[in-house]
């Protein structure tokens, strides 16, 4: 077998040619490097022992699932498709995504000072365009067409570009934010406190949302805002296939989980109304 560093470099090139996103490449190479350093061999039996080792060290099924994806890609890279097929991911229970109510989104926006245009825009883009946090941070000025009200999300999950229409209100917010900036950064959102205006980091987005969420009394994450976008669209009667395209889901089944959220929303509304109970009580 080649030296681990040499193998990892070749594996990175393979993943790039496969069209994997930079985030996926980083994740896969991290786990494969750990596997090789652990002394893993090129077979599913060795990989299963590695997974058992990780489980003993506290890895959840969800985390192990990511490791399996990385190792299967690595085995295919080595031309061992049969070994890749033998390596099955552990079952991960699919929990319903948690969405904020519209009132909670309003509360969140209300605690952001008017002078913090960037912070307000972060919330509006995650909720109003359904972006992933990595997509938000990677947006460049050239990806936004304010006149036509469009955002081009480049290299989303699966390294696929998609076009997301935005309402005039959101386009105006973007324009106001850009007019308040004097830097020459190519990125739509930048770090505020640094002299050199680098692109905004995902970690800072999480931090900002946590801080504003505490002020508003709302538990919020970037994913929750994206989930809220999808759930509220569905509640307004938007076709699920349109929501699939807006979210950038390759499979409709991934989007269909939101129908369960909406059914629960309807069930609660029905239980609150108590129509039958009131009828039978009369």
From Swiss-Prot:
Q: Which InterPro entries match?
A: CB, DNA_brk_join_enz, Integrase-like_cat_sf, Integrase_catalytic, Integrase_recombinase_N, Integrase_SAM-like_N, Tyrosine_recombinase_XerCD, XerA
Q: Does the keyword DNA-binding apply?
A: yes
Query: What are the GO BP annotations of this UniProt entry?
Result: chromosome segregation; DNA recombination; DNA transposition
Q: Does the keyword Ribosomal protein apply?
A: no
Select a single GO molecular function from the record's annotations and give it. site-specific recombinase activity
The chain positions of domain Core-binding (CB) read 2-79
Pfam families, alphabetically? Phage_int_SAM_1, Phage_integrase
Chief location category = cytoplasm
What are the protein's UniProt keywords? Answer: Cytoplasm, DNA integration, DNA recombination, DNA-binding
Transmembrane feature ranges: none
User: What task does this protein carry out?
Assistant: Site-specific tyrosine recombinase, which acts by catalyzing the cutting and rejoining of the recombining DNA molecules.
Please state what the protein is called: Tyrosine recombinase XerA
Organism, as annotated = Thermococcus kodakarensis (strain ATCC BAA-918 / JCM 12380 / KOD1)
């Amino acid at each position: 077998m080649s030296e681990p560093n040499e193998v990892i470099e070749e594996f990175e090139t393979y993943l790039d040619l496969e069209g994997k996103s930079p985030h996926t490449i980083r994740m896969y190479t991290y786990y494969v490097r750990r596997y090789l350093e652990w002394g893993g061999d090129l077979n599913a039996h060795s990989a299963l022992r590695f997974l058992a080792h990780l489980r003993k060290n506290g890895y959840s099924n969800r985390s192990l699932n990511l490791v399996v994806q990385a190792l299967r890609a690595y085995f295919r890279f080595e031309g061992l498709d049969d070994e890749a097929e033998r390596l099955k991911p552990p079952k991960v229970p699919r929990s319903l995504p948690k969405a904020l109510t519209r009132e909670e989104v309003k509360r969140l926006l209300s605690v952001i000072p008017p002078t913090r245009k960037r912070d307000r825009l972060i919330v509006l883009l995650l909720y109003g365009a359904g972006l992933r946090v990595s997509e938000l941070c990677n947006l460049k000025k050239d990806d936004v067409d304010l006149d036509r009200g469009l955002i081009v999300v480049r290299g989303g999950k699966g390294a696929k570009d998609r076009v997301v229409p935005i309402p005039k209100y959101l386009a105006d917010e973007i324009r106001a934010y850009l007019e308040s900036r004097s830097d020459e950064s190519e990125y739509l959102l930048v770090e505020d406190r640094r002299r050199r205006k680098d692109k905004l980091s995902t970690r800072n987005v999480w931090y900002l949302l946590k801080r504003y969420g505490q002020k508003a009394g709302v538990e919020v994450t970037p994913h929750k805002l994206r989930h809220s976008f999808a759930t509220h669209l569905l509640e307004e009667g938007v076709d699920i296939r349109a929501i699939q395209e807006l979210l950038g889901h390759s499979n409709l089944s991934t989007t269909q989980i939101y129908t369960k959220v909406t059914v629960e929303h309807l069930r609660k509304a029905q239980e609150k109304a108590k129509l039958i109970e009131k009828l039978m009580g009369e």
